[in-house]
Amino acid sequence: MISAKMVKDLREKTGAGMMDCKKALTECDGDLEKAVEVLREKGLAAAAKKSGRVAAEGIVSTYISEDMKNGSIVEFNCETDFVSVNELFVELANNLSKQAAFSNVSTAEELLEEKYIADESKLVKDVITELIAKLGENMNLRRIAKLSVDKGVITSYIHGGGRIGVLVKLACEKEDAKLAEIAKDVAMQVAATNPLFLNRDGVDTDTLEKEKEIYRVQALNEGKPEKVVEKMVMGRINKYYKENCLVEQLWVKNGDYTITKYLQEQSKEIGADITVEAFVRYEKGEGIEKKEEDFAEEVQRQMNQGK
């Protein structure tokens, strides 16, 4: 006899629907653990069907250690805005960023194979698969990154409820409470302006030569004499640096300052040099090609799923 309590226990353990739980228990003669396995197998099959669908929504989540010496950032994708704000989805994303901070792995693929920080009886990939089955959408841990510092701080900034996330590494020989505020300013700058590089040294040769060639052709097309073209090219390259290198950008909170000048002013106040050593900026779904569907196609897909 399958009791209501047995169904309730199985539902709480798996998140599956009530009728699915009752069928699984009946199939397994009331054996709870076997019923869990049956539902997991069915859940895995359902998840496999969903894995081909584009997951371009989701959130960016960050985690900063209490001493602000370590930080991590992850992008965790789903298919719709609706699921991206689901409590279970957000909780998993936040746990994944926390796990990344304390893990020795450096890629999302490696993190998927680790034991889950909130339940070490399961692997991260299996926890994600279970949530796919429960919420009915494909999900993907797309990427992770970590920063650490010995002297200085790591901080983060999240914009738009997880649409954009930033990690910043600030180095300073002197420990000062104000460093966290300064790092937050820099992180907000990165979120707002999306710099491509930290400084000029970070601009790779291929990118630089490509930009120079574009500016050279532009100058020649403007009918400028050959002898002044090179000077114009260098002027435009300097402008490129100022727009795309973080430390040369104008500070969004005060256009009279570049980020370098802002850090120099703060260094004087603290009494020690402050430098930005690294940053990471994630924007959810960037670079993912979304499949466009018209309304009729969407209705047909839902009807097919219901068969």
UniProtKB/Swiss-Prot annotation:
GO terms for molecular function: translation elongation factor activity. GO terms for biological process: translational elongation. Its main location: cytoplasm. Residues 80-83 are annotated as: Involved in Mg(2+) ion dislocation from EF-Tu. Gene3D superfamilies: 1.10.286.20, DNA helicase RuvA subunit, C-terminal domain, Elongation factor Ts, dimerisation domain. GO terms for cellular component: cytoplasm. Keywords: Cytoplasm, Elongation factor, Protein biosynthesis. It comes from the Bacteria. CDD domains: UBA_EF-Ts. Coiled coil: none annotated. The keyword Transferase does not apply. It is found in: Cytoplasm. The keyword Plastid does not apply. Associates with the EF-Tu.GDP complex and induces the exchange of GDP to GTP. It remains bound to the aminoacyl-tRNA.EF-Tu.GTP complex up to the GTP hydrolysis stage on the ribosome. NCBIfam families: tsf. Belongs to the EF-Ts family. This is Elongation factor Ts. It comes from Clostridium botulinum (strain Hall / ATCC 3502 / NCTC 13319 / Type A). The gene is tsf.
